[in-house]
Amino acid sequence: MKYGRFLLLLLVACIILLISGIALKIFLVQQPFLAEDVPDWKVQELTPYKWELRSVDDPERSTTAWITRPEKMQCDTLIIVGGVEEGEKLLSGGGKWKYTGNTILMKQPVHSFLLRHYWKNWDLLDWWQIPEKIREETRHTLGALDALLNYVKGAKPEDTRFTDKVVMAGGSVGAPFPVILTSFAPEKVDGLMVVYGFTNFQRVIQPLLFNQGLIHYKLTENSTDFSMEVKITGLRLLTDFFSFLLANMLKYGEMETYLPNISGTPIHFINGTKDPLVPPEAYLPLWDNSPDPKSDTWVEGGHFNPGNPEDMLRTGKLMYEWADAQKLRSCKTVVQ
């Protein structure tokens, strides 16, 4: 009897210790980024339209930036960080991309890194370190974007491609990166755009996990079958828990933490009126915590679809018009 009680107490102590360890880990990893956290990266032009960005301290980490620009013109520059799936084809946009001037799209470095460190090969220690791994990927994305910004902003006088005006934009899950970086050095960024961006990660993540669970287990949400209702309730509780956990892991990416530190840089938000990923409670904290000058545009429809040429046309036009209204647009012919 005493032995059984001892085992029970030992089990309870182990559970409490595990929960405390997880809570401490999440608390440490969720702290906001500071300017000194941004690692050094460098830029190499492979061709006039394709650049390589690589970490200085960890050369295994690299990514690509694509540039589209008018020939023989010196123009302002728009630097874009897209969502997790967006790459070179985003700028082609089925021939619909209409932002004139220099447009640079940076692919998030997480793509190439994960290809070499595929999660199916992870051991238990790797999974335990996943909060730190995600934060490290975010940190290096900031480093790559910082290198790109400094490369364009610090162009030599003989480089006649760029004016001194740079606008940064982040789309969807790529939105936090320009915001975080701008908060560290707002004087470097002449305009900031948040395109279909969001905060309140738990509110965004939970429906995604829940819907994927319904599909995976072939469940129907409105079913009246008792056994199916039990499964759906269990699935909802699990997705509530994991979305809460993930949201707290990613708290350092909440843009409302950094937006108040931006001064003198105009900020513009582009949102969908019926975006299932970005309900009002996932956007309003961004607006409320943004300093003036700020503005927003509401586009009829759902979340931005980079594969839809009409979305590309509409979004590019809105970005162009806003930058022009802020007097950030300029292009002039370069005499060779």
Protein language model features and the residues they cover:
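Histidine-bearing beta->alpha loop at or near hydrolase active sites
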Residues: 299-312
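Cap/lid segment of the alpha/beta-hydrolase catalytic domain
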Residues: 89, 102-143
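N-terminal cap/lid segment of alpha/beta-hydrolase-fold proteins
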Residues: 35-71
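Hydrolase active-site cap/lid region
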Residues: 180-242, 298
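Short, surface-exposed "cap/lid" segments of acyl-processing enzymes
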Residues: 70-100, 105-108, 113-116
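Gly/Ser-rich "nucleophile elbow"/oxyanion-hole loop immediately N-terminal to the catalytic nucleophile
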Residues: 128-167
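Short beta-strand/loop motif that positions the catalytic acidic residue
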Residues: 262, 268-271, 275
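Short alpha-helix in the alpha/beta-hydrolase fold that links the catalytic acid
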Residues: 93, 279-288
